[in-house]
Amino acid sequence: MACTIQKAEALDGARLMQILWYDEEESLYPAVWLRDNCPCSDCYLDSAKARKLLAEALDVNIGIKGLTFDRKKVYITWPDEHYSEFQADWLKKRCLSKQARAKLQRELFFPECQYWGSELQLPTLDFEDVLRYDEHAYKWLSTLKKVGIVRLTGASDKPGEVSKLGKRMGFLYLTFYGHTWQVQDKIDANNVAYTTGKLSFHTDYPALHHPPGVQLLHCIKQTVTGGDSEIVDGFNVCQKLKKNNPQAFQILSSTFVDFTDIGVDYCDFSVQSKHKIIELDDKGQVVRINFNNATRDTIFDVPVERVQPFYAALKEFVDLMNSKESKFTFKMNPGDVITFDNWRLLHGRRSYEAGTEISRHLEGAYADWDVVMSRLRILRQRVENGN
């Protein structure tokens, strides 16, 4: 009954439509919005789920000429005699009330975020189950969005497993290091990850203006001593920083920092970007961390008097990351794949000893959040429909 129409009428000089639903809730719809979203074949291409009506053809002051309704539909005639029919459930879903809009945004963007520190229970699923079953793939990606990290176990100890996950999502994110890349000790390394030294907490690739959203790392070979992985929930650390030192939070969320990456791999590259280390949305919520100390440029485009306060704020942020309450340490085994949110988590690695042979080998890849979210929405629909 919630999507059943009790009454529909035009208001405000016919520039507004009001619907009273059988659950006694009311919805208001501007006439211009209704005309813009007419679902007829002249205005909407159903096969592409795309609007055909041109913006320049829309009368922004349009009113409703005629309106009738039944329990399941509203029928509107416009001043130029164009005719539109709207389904009740379609209208109810797109109600413009604050509560209805918030509900729909939650359905579209999966905003739930579970913060964690050293107490993290690392979410773990079976690699083959994720590839084979939609329910497991949905659990994988929904947990990845909520917690920020999922470990998959049971993959092989051969290269190529991250490519399989890329196909499961849609496709991988190509960077200057290739579709996939090998993390191992290399002579004349073109990235600090390709050494045996300690890697401090960082996000990957802030040197790009659009850093990859999701990272996949598959353990092919693991060293006996050292090489442990460390992760920290950057969003949780940001909350702590904002509470403990609001000025430091303000500096890191307002100062543009230069990042650079120059070298040769998939092709030759010379990359430059500018980011705030803590990136906020229009509501002041943290949406991305952009920080890699290795690729933070020596060029710093700020007035001299702001340099030292920036370093003080950054040190405070890094110290919070490295606190025992914040970081989680684990060791990957051959056949493990960790998948994590590169916009939220910062990751690092403990050093390990170099030998005459390669003692530690990971294969990595990236995915874009748009690709991941697309697959997540499709999987949810399949699981809910029992397909």
From Swiss-Prot:
Keywords in alphabetical order: Carnitine biosynthesis, Cytoplasm, Dioxygenase, Iron, Metal-binding, Oxidoreductase, Phosphoprotein, Zinc
Cofactor note: Binds 1 Fe(2+) ion per subunit.
Catalyzed chemical reaction(s): 4-(trimethylamino)butanoate + 2-oxoglutarate + O2 = carnitine + succinate + CO2
InterPro entries recorded: AlphaKG_dependent_hydroxylases, GBBH-like, GBBH-like_N, GBBH-like_N_sf, TauD-like_sf, TauD/TfdA-like
Cofactor list: Fe(2+); L-ascorbate
CDD domains assigned to the protein according to its UniProt record, in alphabetical order: CAS_like
Localisation: Cytoplasm
Residue numbers binding Zn(2+): 38, 40, 43, 82
Gene3D superfamilies xrefs: 3.30.2020.30, Clavaminate synthase-like (3.60.130.10)
Broad class of enzyme this protein falls into: oxidoreductase
Function: Catalyzes the formation of L-carnitine from gamma-butyrobetaine.
PANTHER family in alphabetical order: GAMMA-BUTYROBETAINE DIOXYGENASE, GAMMA-BUTYROBETAINE HYDROXYLASE-RELATED
Protein name, entry field: Gamma-butyrobetaine dioxygenase
Lineage of origin: Eukaryota, Metazoa, Chordata, Craniata, Vertebrata
Gene giving rise to this polypeptide: BBOX1
